[in-house]
């Protein structure tokens, strides 16, 4: 009798992707975060669907509809906090996933890497439009400030901003379209994630040693399904602790106040996971320059495959580049910290130094260290 999972047209796809997939035998827990991102996406879509059943995308009722969800809907408070903190868990997993890709040289699989960058940008867009929906003070002013950055584009900037707003300021039209975007984008992310997996399975996964493991692969199931399951349980534990014990720790207190266009918050800032890019934006005195630096802070990830000249795969045997890599990680933490501080001395200066260091590390220091290490190998 033929094995159904190997012959059925639909089950065959699942089988080749999650059951009989040849996998390197030595991939560590850092490889768990891809599956965790899939779980985060599913949690966000499901909780978001239930929130959308009770939310109203109207400026007069949006804030009170969120309060209604928390107070009157059965377990509405739990769904809302799982969704809000689920976004934070999503970005934690995303940053670790990208960091692992840089450390172990996964960017050599260029199609997978580039689809990943598109996924990163789409996720950031989804999170941004979602942050506007509760219509609190920081939601409103965050939307105003960030969308207004498009006015820096020469000639078409002003028209483009009004086109996105649907009027002359952030108002009802803006909220309605942001809700529509926030609803559709996760499904686009899901489609891109499948393409991401498709390209990954064309080449096979990388591994910590950076060596070819074709001769020594093992089936994905049961070895890595059980490993992923443990990761998922730990992720759910962390998410439940966050949502049940510290639900507002990552939020902004200003969002407990309904949006008021006549009253500006003392310090406008986005969610914590955008602070590194926000610092880079603020560090450049010129508006257009700041916007370009903001975009480049993410798109610079596409430079990794182009700037890679190393004869070794990954950083496991490369101590010089390892040091530079961890400097980059600390630098990103500094950028995140500065983004949450007011625009005054010494924070502005620290932010400018950290922004310059961020780009210098990736564009200059890493390629130079590659060349030095290549020459050391020849000795």
Swiss-Prot record:
Family: Belongs to the cytochrome b family.
InterPro entries referenced in this protein's UniProt entry, alphabetically: Cyt_b/b6_C, Cyt_b/b6_C_sf, Cyt_b/b6_N, Cytb/b6-like_sf, Cytochrome_b, Cytochrome_b_C_euk/bac, Cytochrome_b_N_euk/bac, Di-haem_cyt_TM
Necessary cofactors: heme b
Superkingdom, natural source: Eukaryota
UniProt-annotated binding residues for a ubiquinone: 201
This protein's UniProt keywords: Electron transport, Heme, Iron, Membrane, Metal-binding, Mitochondrion, Mitochondrion inner membrane, Respiratory chain, Transmembrane, Transmembrane helix, Transport, Ubiquinone
Miscellaneous note of the record: Heme 1 (or BL or b562) is low-potential and absorbs at about 562 nm, and heme 2 (or BH or b566) is high-potential and absorbs at about 566 nm.
Function in brief: Component of the ubiquinol-cytochrome c reductase complex (complex III or cytochrome b-c1 complex) that is part of the mitochondrial respiratory chain. The b-c1 complex mediates electron transfer from ubiquinol to cytochrome c. Contributes to the generation of a proton gradient across the mitochondrial membrane that is then used for ATP synthesis.
GO molecular function, one term: metal ion binding
GO biological process, alphabetically ordered: mitochondrial electron transport, ubiquinol to cytochrome c
Name of the protein in its database record: Cytochrome b
Subcellular location: Mitochondrion inner membrane
Source species: Akodon aerosus
Pfam families: Cytochrom_B_C (PF00032), Cytochrome_B (PF00033)
GO cellular component terms attached to this protein's record: mitochondrial inner membrane; respiratory chain complex III
Membrane topology: Multi-pass membrane protein
UniProt gene name: MT-CYB
Transmembrane segments: 33-53, 77-98, 113-133, 178-198, 226-246, 288-308, 320-340, 347-367
Cofactor note: Binds 2 heme b groups non-covalently.
SUBUNIT field: The cytochrome bc1 complex contains 11 subunits: 3 respiratory subunits (MT-CYB, CYC1 and UQCRFS1), 2 core proteins (UQCRC1 and UQCRC2) and 6 low-molecular weight proteins (UQCRH/QCR6, UQCRB/QCR7, UQCRQ/QCR8, UQCR10/QCR9, UQCR11/QCR10 and a cleavage product of UQCRFS1). This cytochrome bc1 complex then forms a dimer.
Binding site for heme b b562: 83, 182
CDD domains: cytochrome_b_C (cd00290), Cytochrome_b_N (cd00284)
Annotated positions binding heme b b566: 97, 196
